[in-house]
Amino acid sequence: MKVLIIPDVHLKPFMFKQAAELMERGIAKRAVCLMDIPDDWDKQFDISLYEETYDAAISFAKKYPDTAWCYGNHDLSYVWHVPETGYSTMAAYTVQKKLLDLKEVLPESNPIKYAHRIDNVLFSHAGISKDFVDLYVPKIKHDDVDTVLNYINNLGKMKMWYDGSPIWLRPQYTDVKMYKSQQFLQVVGHTPMETITKKKNVISCDVFSTYRDGKPIGTEEFLLLDTITWDYSMVNYGNY
């Protein structure tokens, strides 16, 4: 299946508009969003931008209800009341309400999760390590991927809010062993990259994030992935 991945958003409503137009052109059958919808440099008081971004996400969710949504650390900081870099106390109510609005438009069978699986590809905000699975999933269950994801998706703040979890891991800069690294590809965001990059069985695609002055860190391209063959390409909206 061809899948279009929307990486970390961070108050960029245009990402959903561009992704919607690409989907309309038939570029992919399904979309995945790695979230981190709120927060960006020095935007804590721009409540209208928070509203606009969530409204764009909700509009996209209505149009493409089978989109897989993966919680990011910035999303959960408002759910769990744990201030994060860029956290806006002014926008907290707006984020909480709009996140509920987003949840309400999603099908009951397709809620926001920490991790989703499509064919032999695992999608999460930051990545699922073998150590994390060893820590929180009974060993006898490790070969049943859907059961492993079910265990993970039912964990709470105490187990998820730390550096090794699927909302915080940074496999780009360490030699951490990933879960089922020979059998499954993982697609992650979280760590800003200059370009969409594959390292072993992990594709990192957070290429829309910016420096504090607003200059893009990455190429601002979407990842287009075949979940069967693992073939992938980078899609620049302006050139497609």
Can you name each region flagged by the protein language model?
Residues M1-L4, H116-F123, K198-N201:
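Beta-strand-turn-beta hairpins that frame and shape the catalytic cleft
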Residues H10-M15, D39-D42, H74-H81, S129-D131, ...:
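Active-site environment of divalent metal-dependent phosphoester hydrolases
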Residues M90-D101, P107, I112-K180:
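Active-site-proximal loop/helix segment associated with metal-binding centers of metalloenzymes
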Residues Q172-V235:
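Conserved beta-sheet core of the metallophosphoesterase superfamily
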